[in-house]
Amino acid sequence: MTTSNNHPNWPSLSDRQGLLRDRFPVWTPLTLDGLLAKNAQDYPNRVFVLTDRQSWTYAQMHAWSTQLAAGLCHLGVKPGDHVALLMANFPEFIAIKFAIAMVCAVAVPINFLNKRDELGYVLKQSDAVMLITMDSFRNMPYCRYLDELAPGWQVQGGGDEFPKLKNVLVFATGENGSDNISKHLLLNASFGEGLVLPPGFAPAPNALCDIIYTSGTTGFPKGVMLSHDMLLRTAFGSAWARGFEDGRRIVFSLPLYHVYGYVEGLLACMFVGGSVVPQLKFDAADTLSAIEQHQATDVLLIPAMTMALIDAQKVQPSPLHSLHSVISSGGRAPASLWQDILDYLHPQEITTGYGMTEVTASSTVTRPSDGMTRWLTTNGRLRDVGPAGEPALNQRLVVYRVVDPVSGQEMPPGQVGELQAKGPGVMKAYYNKPDETAAAFTADGWLHTGDLGYLDAEDYLTLVGRLKESYRCGGEQVLPSEVEDVLMSHPAVLQAHVAPIPDERMGEVGVAFVVLRDKMSCESIALEALCKERLARFKQPRHVLFLSASDIPTTPSGRARKFLLSQMALESLGLITPL
């Protein structure tokens, strides 16, 4: 066996990929429950999921998920039904996720930062027949939201407002008492106990597995439809491209309702019989402690998290001897970040990349052998996924072309245009949104990403901006129109326009430009309170600026020119010198 030069006891990338090829020499389409069953047989006593208090082997997780699946079946969940899952990174999320697959149902993971109306929209639009929710988490009162959305939900499910929602199960997090919730509605250790999962459930690999909601240009979230095999081929591709060693152990606090933590962490580790240490929330000290305590070899981060870890290491360094790999992706990163990772986290391999829910997760990554220049100047190379890839696409699942957004002409290497994606890793449709689906694709079947960038001659991709007005705050996508609608619900507000500005910690943050009605007044604190009440934290604007209608730069058709608003915000806040 050969070894990496910078870590003499570590297998080389070719050896690690060889192990994966030995286990999966030819790609055979898989399902989530099928992969869990395979690992429960191949690695029954290997730890799969760890917390600071408990761990579950593959065999134990399979048994737990089977029990939960029997409980779901007993409550009437049928193949093809949609089961909404509003839960943080508890082990129960993982167990119920596989249970949903076992009964051939479709999971609808929901962002647990969603407020009442956001939750209601997803429940209705997804046609969920069941909701599995926490009672509360980080002071988010989900049961109160249900009381307001669907009074009597404990007895009649969604009622008239959500006629397809038949059952709600509640997981008690321990934050608040759940004494007022009937025991038969609780997702606890006894749920499904004594029941037997009927035979005959066998989801097809190309069957719908998840509907994962992402913001879009319509002002409302859109449900991206992903099959079992799309998810697992992409997850295998992550393990292949990053060179997972046997038994890789991954720490992350990225939420499992996102493809980043779900695909690149939970599912990817399964292909090497590895384990995950999911954390309920991000805390730099806790993350470093988890790496040490559980001897993790990998950590999944967005740049804001990476910078927080580096800051913590500067104050009270941990040795992190086990940490071999760091992936930092999903937002803007300062140029100093990559050297700081080497200096303070000491990994042997660093990865960054680019992806989105519509392409199932990462579709470009830097290679383990890449160095500082690639980290600084690119978002990775089109990802070779080994045996899981398409031979016609050079063993890739997603390929990109760069197109002039005005003329539609394909651009040569090095020229900036809109990035468009195609391949078996690209979604087929948004759930129950035919118009949005049609608008998302070109006439010849390429997905509009809405991002501007370029490819070089070696297929490395570099992002330079966004065609869309949406932006990412802390890795979460924000749609300005959604924030603007909330601001304009205030009686004193005539116009509201939200535009992003760069932020070293969060990647981008929103600035709200507000025009007040004549003879009416309003303080920024009132608008901030309104947003705090109605919107998830990452959607709340960092700054509120007041101006007159004549000061809003507009197109001839009267639409606000957001890139000029971003420039105005930077000048007004003193972050750049006015031109």
Where are these regions (language model features)?
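Conserved AMP-binding/adenylation subdomain of ANL enzymes
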Residues: 232-249, 257-298, 311-312
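Conserved ATP-binding/catalytic segment of the ANL
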Residues: 30, 75, 86, 409-414, ...
